[in-house]
Design a protein with these regions (language model features):
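RNA/tRNA-interacting regions in translation and RNA-turnover enzymes
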Residues: 1-232
Length: 232
């Protein structure tokens, strides 16, 4: 009886999270705050970790983002585009530090951290072949993304061709598409917040609609590469 009750509670919470995922990632119109969304997801993960019978192929812990929209062509990421975890208290931070210590097999060592502000937008992947932008993809569900090359080409921060002499034959650049708050001020009547403005604008069917929004792009890492020489 207890198992059946737990499964029922889990299913209700999971269905609710799937609804919010669709609103957040596909409709760009969230119904709840980020903190409430994160708490609901943490509750589900805690249930999965406590009661192993809840885990399945559709486990919450394996889900990133939302399924891609049907209006875009799909493509599988060569390396999954994962999502950052978060915490809202010192307990979560201590857990993070302990995981690092265990991974490094070290104890009683003080860690030094460097940090940077997180830009809240929508993740994008840019593949360059022979220095030219060949394909642009959204994160999608982390495993499969949406091909949005023409939309990404409308962003001035994204070069269509790399001028550098020493550049790999093929490389995937990953980064964040976002909109500055002062730019968002002029279009705030159309979107709930800057993050939704970036996501909604980037996933327009017509690239010319994307061009009308002052989107920015910042790169933070690379995925796969062919011919990249790194000495350190």
């Amino acid at each position: 009886m207890k198992k059946r009750l737990i499964q029922s509670q889990y299913n209700k919470k999971k269905k609710l999270l799937e609804k919010y995922n669709h609103q957040y990632f596909n409709l760009d119109s969230p119904e709840i705050s980020d903190s409430k969304y994160d708490q609901l997801k943490k509750d589900l993960i805690k249930l999965e970790n406590t009661y192993t019978f809840l885990k399945s192929k559709s486990s919450i812990q394996d889900q990133i983002g939302a399924p891609v929209l049907k209006k875009f062509k799909k493509i599988q990421h060569s390396i999954p585009m994962l999502s950052l975890s978060n915490t809202f208290n010192s307990e979560g931070m201590n857990d993070f530090i302990n995981k690092i210590a265990n991974y490094l097999n070290t104890k009683n060592i003080n860690f030094d951290f460097s940090s940077e502000l997180k830009i809240d937008g929508i993740s994008a992947s840019l593949t360059y072949k022979n220095k030219k932008l060949d394909c642009g993809v959204s994160r999608g569900d982390g495993k499969v993304g949406e091909v949005i090359t023409e939309n990404l080409k409308t962003i001035k921060d994204i070069p269509r061709e790399i001028k550098a002499q020493d550049f790999p034959n093929e490389i995937e650049i990953r980064g964040e598409v976002f909109i500055k708050k002062n730019d968002f001020f002029y279009i705030k009547d159309k979107f709930a917040n800057p993050r939704n403005a970036a996501s909604g604008s980037l996933r327009q069917k017509n690239p010319e609609d994307t061009r009308k929004i002052p989107l920015k792009f910042i790169a933070y890492t690379f995925g796969f590469e062919k011919g990249l020489n790194i000495n350190n």
